[in-house]
């Protein structure tokens, strides 16, 4: 009797497994017409699509219930979902890059316009104001403006040294022009140069220009370079490829509902966020240094105003040059006496010119600002836009989910949760790599950060430090901050606080079914999801169970 009961029990178990594996005959004949339409609309061949649902043991990503997807269809849709997410990421990055590039062009054009206007004013007014004192030294003034442009553009020049060399050369040339009756050999001019700091032949103009120009040019070029570095970081991060675990999770998020016969089910919002937080975990780690950079850029715009501000200084370089030449002419006799006292009497030039030409004093044009409100408007727009994108990296998963993934607007128990239509129960993960340790949708190795992104984090830090130095008026050595560096980080790509954590992760196939609860379904919906909700036994177990059942029951049948 006991053997007979055990035999019947095994027969029932085998029958149940067979029924679960093969499904309801009614569901097996369900049409795949809707899936055919969607699949064909994406440009794939309809010959791949079965006319009716088939058994899904072949599926490697989607749940293995009855399905309208062949292996080739699943692979095609997985590749398509991967490409669509990468396209969405690039599109979001392009929008941010375009904004930063527009800001960079606007500020660069304005700063260049200020300097160009100053040089044009000098070229228009100095010949009439100073005569040969300018025309015979026009190249020296052109060279000064060229070097100021190079410095602004980020060339590795020291501005104070550049200005000091300009004043030294100009003093030698002008002193010779003001004393054509004297022979002034090189050693005498060297002596003149050594005493220049004490004699202050150009008055206060060189000192004022040095102090104000350093602050103004450092602020202007650091702000513009900050925009360039930010744009370059966005471009390089957009090129970071998505990992294979991310690709699987995105396929399951976007297209597995189609394969399981519920193409109308849209992803649950929290489900989508967990998938993309896992996919973009490394990108979210940019957040802290990204915010620091943008904050520093907003802060340095305070240096655009005032008597030492960008607008007051860069557009008025010519006025300090005019003041300097006037001071030299006014102090000519006193200066000459002090030079002779310190360097000795120079020899008279027997071929020198006749009577001294009448001095020409240049009239100083007022230091006019550009059209009122130009820079104020630029700064106001830049501040608003930079603040708008401060949370770009941590808000990216939510933005992509809401704008690109067609999230469900139905009640929580009607959205696609990765297994079927139903409520999505897992909590939403935090931002960044370390917070993905328990991500239920994407398996993330938190001990292996992406090195491209780590390098970009370092570039953000470097640029932020330069902006802070510029805010304090310090001349910093600007190298190309966009160069890829490999000196940051350890060789194995680990962070100290992450590598010490040994993590044992379960694969996605071992997640408990309790994370995706199935609500009460209508009879029709229950037929659609019954196959998906039933676990699939290996095919070879079915005949084995039947054999065992027959063996156990055999004594009673004899």
UniProtKB/Swiss-Prot annotation:
Keywords, ordered alphabetically: Cell membrane, Copper, Disulfide bond, Endosome, Glycoprotein, GPI-anchor, Heparan sulfate, Lipoprotein, Membrane, Proteoglycan, S-nitrosylation, Secreted, Signal, Zinc
Biased composition (Basic and acidic residues): 355-370
Cellular location(s): Cell membrane; Endosome
Topology term for the membrane: Lipid-anchor; GPI-anchor
Region (Disordered): 341-374, 505-534
InterPro entries, per database record: Glypican, Glypican_CS
Propeptide, chain numbering: 531-558
Glycan attachment sites: 79, 116, 486, 488, 490
Highest taxon listed in the record's lineage: Eukaryota
Cysteines paired by S-S bonds: 32-68, 62-256, 69-259, 191-343, 246-279, 268-415, 272-401
Keyword Acetylation: no
Lipidated positions per record (GPI-anchor amidated serine): 530
Modifications after synthesis and translation: S-nitrosylated in a Cu(2+)-dependent manner. Nitric acid (NO) is released from the nitrosylated cysteines by ascorbate or by some other reducing agent, in a Cu(2+) or Zn(2+) dependent manner. This free nitric oxide is then capable of cleaving the heparan sulfate side chains.
GO MF terms, alphabetically ordered: copper ion binding; fibroblast growth factor binding; laminin binding
Keyword Disulfide bond found: yes
Listed GO CC annotations: cell surface; collagen-containing extracellular matrix; cytosol; endosome; extracellular exosome; extracellular matrix; extracellular region; extracellular space
Phenotype upon changing residue 79 to Q: Protein yield reduced by half. Protein yield reduced by 90%, abolishes N-glycosylation but no effect on secondary structure
GO biological process: cell migration; heparan sulfate proteoglycan catabolic process; myelin assembly; negative regulation of fibroblast growth factor receptor signaling pathway; positive regulation of skeletal muscle cell differentiation; regulation of protein localization to membrane; Schwann cell differentiation
Chief localization: membrane
Disease: Associates (via the heparan sulfate side chains) with fibrillar APP amyloid-beta peptides in primitive and classic amyloid plaques and may be involved in the deposition of these senile plaques in the Alzheimer disease (AD) brain. Misprocessing of GPC1 is found in fibroblasts of patients with Niemann-Pick Type C1 disease. This is due to the defective deaminative degradation of heparan sulfate chains.
Protein role: Cell surface proteoglycan that bears heparan sulfate. Binds, via the heparan sulfate side chains, alpha-4 (V) collagen and participates in Schwann cell myelination. May act as a catalyst in increasing the rate of conversion of prion protein PRPN(C) to PRNP(Sc) via associating (via the heparan sulfate side chains) with both forms of PRPN, targeting them to lipid rafts and facilitating their interaction. Required for proper skeletal muscle differentiation by sequestering FGF2 in lipid rafts preventing its binding to receptors (FGFRs) and inhibiting the FGF-mediated signaling.
Family, per entry: Belongs to the glypican family.
Name this polypeptide is given: Glypican-1
């Amino acid at each position: 009797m006991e053997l007979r009961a055990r035999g019947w029990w095994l027969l029932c178990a085998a029958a149940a497994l067979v029924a679960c594996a093969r499904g309801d005959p009614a569901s097996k004949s369900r049409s795949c017409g809707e899936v055919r339409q969607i699949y064909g609309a994406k440009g794939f061949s309809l010959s791949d699509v079965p006319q009716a649902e088939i058994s899904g043991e072949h599926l490697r990503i989607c749940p293995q219930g009855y399905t309208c997807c062949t292996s080739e269809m699943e692979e095609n849709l997985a590749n398509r979902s991967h490409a669509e997410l990468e396209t969405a990421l690039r599109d979001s990055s392009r929008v941010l890059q375009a904004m930063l590039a527009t800001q960079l062009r606007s500020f660069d054009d304005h700063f260049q316009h200020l300097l160009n206007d100053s040089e044009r004013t000098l070229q228009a007014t100095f010949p009439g104001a100073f005569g040969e004192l300018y025309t015979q030294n026009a190249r020296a003034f052109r060279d000064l403006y060229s070097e100021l442009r190079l410095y602004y553009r980020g060339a590795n020049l020291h501005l104070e040294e550049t200005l000091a060399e300009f004043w030294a050369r100009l003093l030698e040339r002008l002193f010779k022009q003001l004393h054509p009756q004297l022979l002034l050999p090189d050693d005498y001019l060297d002596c003149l140069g050594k005493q220049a700091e004490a004699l202050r032949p150009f008055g206060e103009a060189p000192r004022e220009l040095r102090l104000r120009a350093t602050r103004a040019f450092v602020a202007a070029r650091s702000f513009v370079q900050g925009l360039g570095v930010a744009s370059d970081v966005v471009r390089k991060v957009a090129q970071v490829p998505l990992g294979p675990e991310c690709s699987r999770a995105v396929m399951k998020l976007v297209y597995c509902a189609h394969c399981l016969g519920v193409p109308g089910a849209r992803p649950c919002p929290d489900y989508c966020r967990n998938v993309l937080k896992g996919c973009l975990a490394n990108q979210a780690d940019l957040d802290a240094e990204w915010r620091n950079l943008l904050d520093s850029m907003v802060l340095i715009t305070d240096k655009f105003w005032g008597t030492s501000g960008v607008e007051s200084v860069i557009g008025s370089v010519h006025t300090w040059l005019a003041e300097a030449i006037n001071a030299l002419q006014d102090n000519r006799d006193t200066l000459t006496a002090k030079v002779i006292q310190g360097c000795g009497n120079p020899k008279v030039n027997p071929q020198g010119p006749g009577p001294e030409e009448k001095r020409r004093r240049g009239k100083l044009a007022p230091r006019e600002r550009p059209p009122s409100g130009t820079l104020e408007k630029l700064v106001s727009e830049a501040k608003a836009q930079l603040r708008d994108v401060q949370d770009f990296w941590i808000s990216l998963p939510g933005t992509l989910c809401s704008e690109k993934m067609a999230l469900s607007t139905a009640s929580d128990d009607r959205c696609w949760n990765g297994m079927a239509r139903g409520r999505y129960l897992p909590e939403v993960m935090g931002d960044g790599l370390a917070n993905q340790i328990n991500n239920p949708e994407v398996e993330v190795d938190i001990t292996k950060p992406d090195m491209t992104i780590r390098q970009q984090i370092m570039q953000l830090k470097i640029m932020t430090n330069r902006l802070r130095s510029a805010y304090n008026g310090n001349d910093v050595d600007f190298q190309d901050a966009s160069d890829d560096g490999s000196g940051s980080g350890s060789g194995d790509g680990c962070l100290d606080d992450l590598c010490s954590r040994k993590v044992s992760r379960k694969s996605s196939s071992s997640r408990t079914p309790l994370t995706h609860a199935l609500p009460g379904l209508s009879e029709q919906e229950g037929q659609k999801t019954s196959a998906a909700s039933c676990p699939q036994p290996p095919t070879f177990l079915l005949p084995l169970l039947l054999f065992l059942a027959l063996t156990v029951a055999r004594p009673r049948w004899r």
